[in-house]
A protein has these predicted regions:
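Hydrophobic/basic alpha-helical segments
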Residues: 1-177
């Protein structure tokens, strides 16, 4: 366990170890966790919280939000949304495979409306909340349409990622001074 060898590691070595062993596992295919019940996401969040406490040498019983903010880490719920929205951006800009691109439909009204330039996506109707709303086909447009327009209209992927992470960071940590 990293916690047992932590006294012998520098801060940089600990960050590298945690990033390679813990964070990489949390981020691997986490877009598949879209719509998973909060009880399951919270279990994974506890793993991220423990890793953050090991890096910063804080008590595991202390409040985790300031620790995550100090490390510039998004909570797992927002990391999942970040990955889903990144796939969505890539699909809209022809930077991903055809089968993902085919899942996303751009909203085009039949007549002239103010919303025609909003870069919105069509959210398909679903029959079941448990499976339908969890699917990428439904979740991606819902998350995309909730973003501010200046983020959706980003010119490059790197700009989009930067603005999206800043947006999520403000949403998560704006209540902390």
């Amino acid at each position: 366990s990293i916690g047992h060898i932590r006294p012998y590691l520098t801060n940089e070595a600990t960050k590298t170890l945690v990033n390679s062993l813990v964070t990489s596992r949390l981020d691997y295919c986490n877009a598949m966790l879209t719509g998973v019940p909060n009880t399951l996401v919270n279990k994974l969040q506890r793993t991220q919280n423990t890793a953050a406490c090991i890096i910063t040498r804080t008590s595991r019983y202390s409040h985790n939000t300031p620790v995550l903010k100090e490390l510039h880490w998004l909570p797992l719920k927002y990391r999942i949304q970040y990955k889903t929205l990144t796939f969505t951006y890539k699909a809209l800009h022809d930077q991903t495979t055809d089968y993902i691109r085919d899942m996303i439909k751009v909203y085009k009204p039949n007549r002239a409306l103010r919303s025609q330039d909003s870069l919105s996506l069509v959210v398909p109707n679903v029959r079941t909340v448990s499976f339908g709303e969890r699917s990428f086909v439904h979740a991606a447009p819902s998350l995309w349409n909730a973003l501010p327009h200046h983020i959706r209209s980003s010119e490059t992927l790197s700009t989009f990622k930067k603005l999206l992470k800043t947006h999520f960071f403000l949403v998560c940590y704006s209540h902390i001074i």
